[in-house]
Amino acid sequence: FNPTFPNHKNGDGSWDGVTNASQITNPLAWMEVKDKESVSRISTHAKLLLNFTPDLKMRLFGSYSYNMVENSQYLPTVVWAHGQAYRGVRKSESLVGNAMLTYRKRLKRHFIDALALAEVQEEKFSGFYTTVTNFSSDLFGFDNLQAGALRPWEGTNSYYERTRLLSFMGSANY
């Protein structure tokens, strides 16, 4: 970048530099970028022990996690030719349930040891984002995406994925 440009704005509020090209702006103009990120997280766990008899026991475990990340960014017209706004949300959820049943019995010279396990798991991922360019003013930023005139190719997308797993296991010893 041209080192002879001043380290402050001009009298009209603009930065010296090539303002009609993207990503060739005065590096100090990048301080005017509006960037916001919001993160929400919830994580819970529970465990329950049941003793039906001294020989028969059950353990139950469950957990739930939720994550959401919201991103918003506005590159003003002094940074990106005609400005650019981006908004996106990513969410994930995870649910796990686990059950374990044990039986241990001694009868004189005999010993029985049995185990039964079951687990269920589900995960969900979803999100969307959109990018808008060609703003006539920096007045709205990322708060009004309609103010931008163009949506670039592949500038908007959404997705959803859901996976599940169910498993069982058992063992017996004599």
Language model features with spans:
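Surface-exposed loop/interface segments of Gram-negative outer-membrane beta-barrel transport/assembly proteins
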Residues: F1-R41, R59-S167
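Outer-membrane beta-barrel strand-turn architecture
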Residues: L50-P54, K105-K108
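Residues on the lipid-exposed face of transmembrane beta-strands in outer-membrane beta-barrel proteins
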Residues: A46-L50, A99-Y103, G170-Y174
